[in-house]
Amino acid sequence: MTSPLPNVNTAQTEPPASVSFWQAFGFWLKLGFISFGGPAGQIAIMHEELVVRRRWLSEKRFLHALNYCMVLPGPEAQQLATYIGWLMHKTRGGIVAGVLFVLPSLFLLIALSWIYIAYGQVAWVAGLFYGIKPAVTAIVIQAAHRIGSRALKNNLLLAIAAASFVAIFALNVPFPLIVLAAALIGFVGGRMRPEFFSAGGGHAASQANFGTALINDDTPTPSHAVFSFKRLMQVLLSGFVLWALPMGYLVTQNGWDHTFTQMSWFFTKAALLTFGGAYAVLPYVYQGAVEQFGWITATQMIDGLALGETTPGPLIMVVAFVGFVGGYVKAVLGPDSLFLAGALAAMLVTWFTFLPSFIFILAGGPFVESTHNDLKFTAPLTAITAAVVGVIVNLALFFGYHTLWPQGFTGSLDIPSALIAVAAAVALLKFKLNVMHVIGVCGLLGICLQYGLK
């Protein structure tokens, strides 16, 4: 990605040559290994590669797809890759694009989770996480600021964000109820006062012109992307079978209360609630994985997010860490198969977390294209996105508390951690430094502190 960008004033008028399935396969495989930087960075990479350099689709078609991926629960960057793959090469193109977006990070996280759980007490590893944890707190604060600055366009949306914060922080209201309440407010409010809900968290169209694209603004919708009730039923039935078969096997073989079964059911629910991306669903994962089931500890949850920030792929892949640690610590396959238990748990939760995203795109792609700019459809999203801001602020406080006061408020403030957190926040918010660079520097500081260079 070092070639110069096209000059928008001298855009090419001829579309590029048609792209074969295997050419696209090569790109999606590459993307799976370079998709660092969270959803914003991943979407930027796809925009540069697919719109600017390769011209596989136009700016308008790209943003149209992105806006509707934002409507759906689930990781929007992975869904966008699935959507574009589907638009270009039908169902198999969508499946390949979505799977390759996730697969490298799954294997990396299984390996890193094993190193973490097996060697986490080694001095340099402990020091690395000591430095990264405060950086993660700053990253979550940055996420709240970024989403809030885009989503809270008026006082009503600000009030929704404040109410969601109070609900989850002070009243411990479950995250699903917060999402439902926000959606209802948006649904009703979009009819009563539409002006308050027309400035939601979508992505505005750009006037940039990078040349004629393979799928251009006026390119007719491919036949496979035209809505068909029969095709919709086929996709929904196939998706249900792909969910029901492994779930049924787990229930019949292990019982409903087995760790594998509970993980599969819990992360199925989590997949349907990830409006606003990974940061929005993490409080729900925390409520279940830490407080309800005890699969991991609060400290491990923070460490898992740190690992998720440093690997390619969707940030929601932190669920693979939760699954691995839970399966490993619970020794669900016995004391002699700890790694296998962790790896199977990681793969299970990844399957049940991402399966709904594929169903949403393959089944709903034709439908959501027909609802472009329909306020009845987008107003609930606007309200949910506002509520997500309050939830993320709560998440930042949760991480800050456990990082800066490791013994609770009765103990003393961890001054080095506080200084690292402040420095990371300044680097991210004021100087707009790369997240990976900030994490790397903070990790090195943690190692130095661990070895006594205070």
Language-model region placement:
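Multi-pass membrane proteins that catalyze or facilitate reactions on polyprenyl-/lipid-phosphate substrates
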Residues: 1-72, 76, 83-311, 315-454
